[in-house]
A protein has these predicted regions:
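Active-site loop/oxyanion-hole signature of alpha/beta-hydrolase fold enzymes
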Residues: 1-30, 211
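Core-facing hydrophobic residues within beta-strands of well-ordered domains
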Residues: 11, 24, 49-50, 186-189, ...
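A catalytic-pocket lid/entrance helix-loop region that shapes and gates access to the active site
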Residues: 56-89
Length: 220
C-alpha cells in the first residue's frame, strides 16, 4: 500500500472476494476483532449477500471524540514518512515466545505453529512477520461507532456472536443492547462464550471455537 489502509477498502475487499468465489450464492462470513467488525458491517450493507455471520469479538471500538480530530489528522500526516519495520527475530522459537507472552493460554507448541504461519525467513537467516508494516499506520479518520451500528441494524443473516470467557470484550455487548438497537440482529442472534480464552480465541481455544462454528452452520 502507498499509504495507510482505509477502513472502507476492507468492505470492498469482501465484495470482490464474493464476486470471485461465490457470485451466485450468499457468503458465510467469519471475522475476528476488526475482521468481525468489517464482516458485520458488510452483512448490514449487503444483507442479501450474507446467509451466516460469525462475529468473534468484533464489535469495534467505543465512539470516538470529534475533539480528537485535529491531533488524529496531525498524527496521520506525520506518520506517512515514518513507517517502522517489524522487528526481526533470531528464530521461530523467539517469535513464538513473544506470541505466548501476549497469549498466556496457548502452549509453546501451538505458538511455534502460529509463528511458522505468520513469519518468513530472510536472507540473513532472521525471522520477520510476513505482513505490511503500513497496516500499523493510523487512519486519518476516527472510528465512528454510530455508523457501524447503523449497518448492524440491517443485518438479516443468521448470526453467532462469540466471546472469550476471560475477555473484557463481552462488556461491549451490554451498552449495545441497552441503547437503541432493541429488536435488532444482536438481540436475535446466538451468543456463546469460549472457556479458557481471552480475546485471541482462535489461538487459545481453536478446537472449541471450530466446534461452535460448525454446529451453528450445520444446525441453522
Amino acid at each position: 500500500n502507498e499509504s495507510c489502509y482505509w477502513f472502507p477498502d476492507y468492505l470492498a475487499d469482501i465484495d470482490e472476494i464474493k464476486k470471485i468465489f461465490s457470485p451466485d450464492k450468499p457468503l458465510m462470513l467469519i471475522g475476528h476483532s476488526m475482521g468481525g467488525n468489517v464482516a458485520s458491517m458488510y452483512a448490514g450493507i449487503f444483507p442479501e449477500n450474507v446467509s451466516h455471520l460469525v462475529n468473534v469479538e468484533g464489535f469495534g471500538l467505543k465512539e470516538s471524540d470529534p475533539n480528537n480530530a485535529p491531533s488524529r489528522y496531525q498524527q496521520w500526516i506525520e506518520k506517512q514518512n515514518d513507517v517502522q519495520s517489524f522487528r526481526e527475530y533470531d528464530s521461530l522459537y523467539d517469535l513464538a515466545s513473544r506470541i505466548k507472552k501476549r497469549n498466556q493460554n496457548i502452549s509453546i507448541e501451538r505458538a511455534i505453529y502460529v509463528a511458522s504461519q505468520w513469519a518468513e525467513k530472510l536472507d540473513t537467516g532472521k525471522i520477520k512477520l510476513r505482513a505490511d508494516p503500513k497496516h500499523k499506520l493510523p487512519n486519518a479518520t476516527q472510528y465512528r461507532r454510530s455508523e457501524a451500528e447503523a449497518c448492524w441494524r440491517l443485518i438479516s443473516a443468521k448470526t453467532l456472536c462469540v466471546f472469550g470467557k476471560n475477555s473484557s470484550f463481552f462488556k461491549e455487548v451490554i451498552p449495545i443492547q441497552e441503547n437503541n438497537i432493541n429488536k435488532s440482529w444482536l438481540n436475535n442472534s446466538k451468543t456463546v462464550e469460549i472457556p479458557g480464552a481471552g480475546h485471541m480465541i482462535h489461538l487459545e481455544n481453536p478446537e472449541f471455537l471450530a466446534n461452535e462454528i460448525e454446529n451453528f452452520i450445520m444446525n441453522e
